[in-house]
């Protein structure tokens, strides 16, 4: 079985991958995340996920039997990607734009080894209730929005804004587990390895 590496600094992706019982090692993979002109959100997240996986693979010894996972998430409103907020004003503008509306969250996950690569893209729809400006300001002071695509974390304090979700909850958090498990299986890496040897 190949060794699995996760090319991501996201603690949320580490937690999700741990949740499905897959051992892995974290790698640092820095790539340029600037969107191309006229690039669709789906093409953008797929390119970044694959780029992270390939960048991670490139730092490993060539003789090592390894598989590297990369992932990327984008929050999309009216066809526009909402990245991580640069400051408080940006975060508040994002939250007020999302207020009372439905938006899309696209997450791509990619796996690659020395012979091949494969990707999955999962699109979910999230609807926010109306958000008051004082709520958005209070949420900013929590520190939670600063490093999150779209300026919010569905698994955190922003859960109270969510009226509904269609799609993959784990995908919105940062790693769609159903599709991730399918990809891992194609590369010979089973989930639930934590259960091996437990015959009781």
Curated annotation (Swiss-Prot):
<feature type="site" description="Important for substrate specificity">
    <location>
        <position position="73"/>
    </location>
</feature>
<dbReference type="GO" id="GO:0005737">
    <property type="term" value="C:cytoplasm"/>
</dbReference>
<dbReference type="GO" id="GO:0036218">
    <property type="term" value="F:dTTP diphosphatase activity"/>
</dbReference>
<feature type="site" description="Important for substrate specificity">
    <location>
        <position position="12"/>
    </location>
</feature>
<dbReference type="GO" id="GO:0036221">
    <property type="term" value="F:UTP diphosphatase activity"/>
</dbReference>
<dbReference type="InterPro" id="IPR003697">
    <property type="entry name" value="Maf-like"/>
</dbReference>
<protein>
    <recommendedName>
        <fullName>dTTP/UTP pyrophosphatase</fullName>
        <ecNumber>3.6.1.9</ecNumber>
    </recommendedName>
</protein>
<feature type="site" description="Important for substrate specificity">
    <location>
        <position position="155"/>
    </location>
</feature>
<keyword id="KW-0378">Hydrolase</keyword>
<dbReference type="InterPro" id="IPR029001">
    <property type="entry name" value="ITPase-like_fam"/>
</dbReference>
<dbReference type="GO" id="GO:0009117">
    <property type="term" value="P:nucleotide metabolic process"/>
</dbReference>
<dbReference type="Pfam" id="PF02545">
    <property type="entry name" value="Maf"/>
</dbReference>
<keyword id="KW-0963">Cytoplasm</keyword>
<feature type="active site" description="Proton acceptor">
    <location>
        <position position="72"/>
    </location>
</feature>
<keyword id="KW-0546">Nucleotide metabolism</keyword>
<comment type="similarity">
    <text>Belongs to the Maf family. YhdE subfamily.</text>
</comment>
<comment type="function">
    <text>Nucleoside triphosphate pyrophosphatase that hydrolyzes dTTP and UTP. May have a dual role in cell division arrest and in preventing the incorporation of modified nucleotides into cellular nucleic acids.</text>
</comment>
